[in-house]
Amino acid sequence: MTQLGAILIPTGNIADLDRERSRRSLGPDVRPDSKKKRNYLLTPAYRTTSLLEILGYTETQLAAYLEHIRWGGLGLGVQACPKCGSIDRHYRCASINGWKCKGCAKQFSVLSGTRVHGMKMSLKTFMSFAMHFMEAKDSMSSRELSGLHDLDYQTAHVLTLKVREAIRETMGSEGPLTGYVQADAAYFMKYVRPGNVGTGAALAAKEIQKNAGLDEDGKLPAKVNESMHALVVFVQAGQQCHRRYRIAMIKTENQVDLLTLGQQFCAKEAILVTDQHSAYNFFSGEFVAHHQVNHNKEFQTRDGVNTNLAENIFSRIRAAVHGAWHRMSVQNLVEYGWEVAWRQEMVGSDNL
């Protein structure tokens, strides 16, 4: 039996099933008068595009849809040649579902000059891939995306990396953070898998090895994973859709790296909020104001000062690790952080 076949097994009398269905809640969309504040992601306003709608489009319609996204600001039917930059109503070239430049005579498509230039998959597969990636709650693994779209795992993995790189480039190119800015850091990939505990001679050898490694206080030195790095998050506070993020990776929390990142990401007029880690001490003389929260005593001061927006990113990253990725690499740690920041920034925007 297939996995889908289990859903189609008869479970009882149809009349009983209809009565059970009538007793069920019909969801939040049928209660518009409810005074309880609803998550924007649950409202019809969020669902501007659906996967079923995308799958119903032809390749030509999808090309026109992407053309509007890329060149819509230039005018109706106007394209910009990726080769020479000529902006015109170029000759239509049906053989490649694209255009031929009036200036340099080069052929190009809507994906030419982008990160997916020369992509072999169809636009329908590409749009479905993008829709699944965007609609995932925390994230979606490359293996799952490869299975849904009949792609080689490496193809799906590389495409997700290209998407994350585009997110980092787009969000990171904005101006410096201003106003009320929260900053925090958290360590990832710090787990060290314990070795197998043997018996007899193997256990005795392990005890000798442990005793030989005791420090001055007779304690075992802490095991540290060589891959462990700190992810630093700067968040410009504000309403949903108006928060801005900056993500960076450092080996450890230290004054030199954190001050450099603060100067790089934040305007001097910003008001910084951090915890009481000594690495943030130099922020006081660099920015207009610097508030600190003593996390040993409280998560938020009586004045409402906290770093919850920055810490929320770390919570979502850990949720994505457990629920989707299962592992991360140092090479792509920053991209994973940018993806989560992008998902958080898009809360309050439509889905496509």
Question: What spans do the regions from the language model cover?
Answer:
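Residue-level recognition of single "structural anchor" positions
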Residues: T2-L352
